[in-house]
Amino acid sequence: VFCSNPVEGYRHTTDKYSYDVLKKKVFDYKRGLQTFVKFDEVGDYFNLTGGEPTLHPDFLKILALIRTEFPQNLIRLLSNGRTMADPDFARRTCGIGGHPFEIAVPMFGGDARSHEAISRTPGSFAQTSEGLRNLQKHRKPGQIVEIRIIMTKVQARFLDGLVDYLLAEFPWVDRVVFLYEEIEGFAEMYKDRLLFTQSECSAHIDRNYDKLKKFKDVRMYHFSLCAVPTRLWPHVWNTLAGFKITWLEGCRTKCQYRDQCVGVHRSYVKHTGAPDIAPIETPRPVTFTGDPYHPILSSDGDAVRA
C-alpha cells in the first residue's frame, strides 16, 4: 500500500504517501479503480509494506481507514517488529487490525550479534523479540503472527541458532516462512555476499527438518521444486507473480511437476544461470492438494532426498 521510508527519504514522498493521498486511493479503489498493484488472482487483500510501514506518522489512521472501508478483507502487515516493543502500540495495532489480520516479522539470528550483523541496527534484536512477545499478548482471536527468514548466504550461517531460538522463545507463532532472496534493487550491489543456489539454500533448511516439524506451520516461498529435497515439498508455496518468473528449456515439456512448480525467478536465472534447475522426469512419492498456491499435501520423501 505504501513505502513510508524509501531510499530518498520520507520528505520526498509526502505527495505520494500522505494520509490524504492514501485516503483518496482507498476510496478510489473501493469504487473499482486500480489504484493499488494487484499481483495475483487471490481475493483482494492489502499488504502494508515499505520500508517500515509502522514508521509512517499516520500508520494507525491508515490501518483504521482500510479496516473500516474493507471490513472483510485480509490485511497483512510486513514489519520489522521493533515498534511493537511498545506494548501500547502493539495493543492498538492488533485492536485496529481486526480480522482477518496478519503480521509478518523477519528474524535474522538467535542472538544480538548474529541478528544485528544483518539488520545493521544496534538494539534491534531485543526490540524485535520484545515486539513478538507483545504481539502474542495483544493479538486478537484469529489474528496470525508470522516469522519470516530471508534466506541468503549470510543468513544461512546463523540459521541453526535462529531455529533453536525461535523454538525456545516463540513456539506459539502461527507460521515460520523461509523466503529465497529475490536479487533485486540494493541486493544486486551485494549479490556476491548474499547469493547462493536454491539447492544450497534448501539444504540448510533440510538440516533443521526435525526441529521445524515442531512449529505449527512452516512454508518455503520462491523455491523451484527440483532444487528442494522431496520431503520439504509439502512446505513449498507458490507465491511469485507471473511477471517475475520464467521456465527453462525442458521444464515446460519434460517435467512431471510443471503444474505444481512456481517456475524460476528471472533474477535467479540472470544472476546464477540457474545451475540446479532441471526437469524432474521420474515421479516422486507425493500427494497433491489441487491448490495451485500450495500444491503438495504430503510426501514420503525421507526415502527420496533429491
For every predicted segment, state its role:
Residues 9-13, 111-119, 185-191:
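A short acidic, helix-capping loop that chelates divalent metal ions and anchors anionic groups
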Residues 1, 8, 108-110, 181-184:
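Short connector loops/turns at beta-strand edges and beta->alpha or beta->beta junctions
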Residues 1-24:
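Canonical Radical SAM [4Fe-4S] cluster-binding loop centered on the CxxxCxxC motif
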Residues 6, 228-306:
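Flexible mid-to-C-terminal extensions adjoining Fe-S/redox cofactors in radical SAM and related proteins
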Residues 15-18, 22, 121-124, 155, ...:
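Residue-level preference for long, well-ordered alpha-helices that form the structural scaffold
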Residues 26, 30-47, 56-179:
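Radical SAM/AdoMet-radical enzyme domain recognition
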